[in-house]
Amino acid sequence: MNIKSLLLGSAAALVAASGAQAADAIVAPEPEAVEYVRVCDAYGAGYFYIPGTETCLRVHGYVRYDVKGGDDVYTGSDRKGWDKGARFALMFNTNSETELGTLGTYTQLRFNYTSNNSRHDGQYGDFSDDRDVADGGVSTGTDLQFAYITLGGFKVGIDESEFHTFTGYLGDVINDDVVAAGSYRTGKIAYTFTGGNGFSAVIALEQGGEDVDNDYTIDGYMPHVVGGLKYAGGWGSIAGAVAYDPVIEEWATKVRGDVNITDRFSVWLQGAYSSAATPNQNYGQWGGDWAVWGGAKFIATEKVTFNLQAAHDDWGKTAVTANVAYQLVPGFTITPEVSYTKFGGEWKDTVAEDNAWGGIVRFQRSF
């Protein structure tokens, strides 16, 4: 055997061995394409598509810490020290388009922690039976604050009453409802018509709400009923709402006007009337037949906004509040606020002191 034959034989053996190994090799499948999260800008900033769907989701919320001192301007009692409270609010919005309009949901979870001054000097202990210190101590709570579905102008679920939301609440101050304007959270079914000329209207059937001392839910099949009309333009808006309370068979109404003096300065005024001259009802919770609120906002700079609100009711309660909202950095706002309440007339017999001065500083990180 010559050298040439030996080389040819070796080459043939190598080719055969390579073919056998190739036949036994495992071929890896092609990797599936990764579906990255897509931004959804159809409903504003912060939305993204839920993978595999055409539904847009937004996750947002805030962390808040309040420090309060002085008097409680709602009750007139002396805090006798610092009251402090924290809240973490987590919110979810979803939206998608259907043949009947935009289908949406909104939910908000609140986790609260309150640590108030004990209201008792020089000692610890359980003072829950002492009315002078009942608001002291530590409390915690978790709430499903909101959970509702929207489709076009239709809304069903847990929300705040249209008696508040449709007209625009009150001012941009923390202690805005010292003169109360009605209960807030409720189960409801509502429909809002929005025209193309600035006109809108609402009708709502509501279950009723509650506050610290009273339950204002309905006592049968007849719901609370709220209706409202609004006209809005570049100059501002005017809105009115009327509500019927079937439990006490009385009604309440209010009208609010907002005017944009400039792009930085705006004012508002709201008047309300109730056929039942008592705060113990679902809607007209001010004292007496009537109440009035008013306020102003001035955007001084991109970081600083001044807010002022005043209110007075038929029974003689007067409340004034002012604050400065300072945006330290984007997403983090510090708001010092000072409030004063004068309890006159029929309110004198319900509070500890006729005059109350209180202060609060709020630290809030929104995301």
Swiss-Prot record:
One Pfam entry name: Porin_2
Assigned keywords, A-Z: Cell outer membrane, Ion transport, Membrane, Porin, Signal, Transmembrane, Transmembrane beta strand, Transport
BP-aspect Gene Ontology terms: monoatomic ion transport
InterPro entries reported in the protein's UniProt record: Porin_alphabac
Its biological purpose: Forms passive diffusion pores that allow small molecular weight hydrophilic materials across the outer membrane.
Note: The pore formed by Omp2a is larger than the one formed by Omp2b. Omp2b pores have optimal permeability to allow growth and protection against harmful compounds. The larger pore formed by Omp2a may be advantageous for intracellular growth, when the bacterium is competing with the host cell for nutrients whose concentration is particularly low within the phagosome.
Family membership: Belongs to the alphaproteobacteria porin family.
Protein name from the UniProt record: Porin Omp2a
The species this protein was found in: Brucella suis
Gene field: omp2a
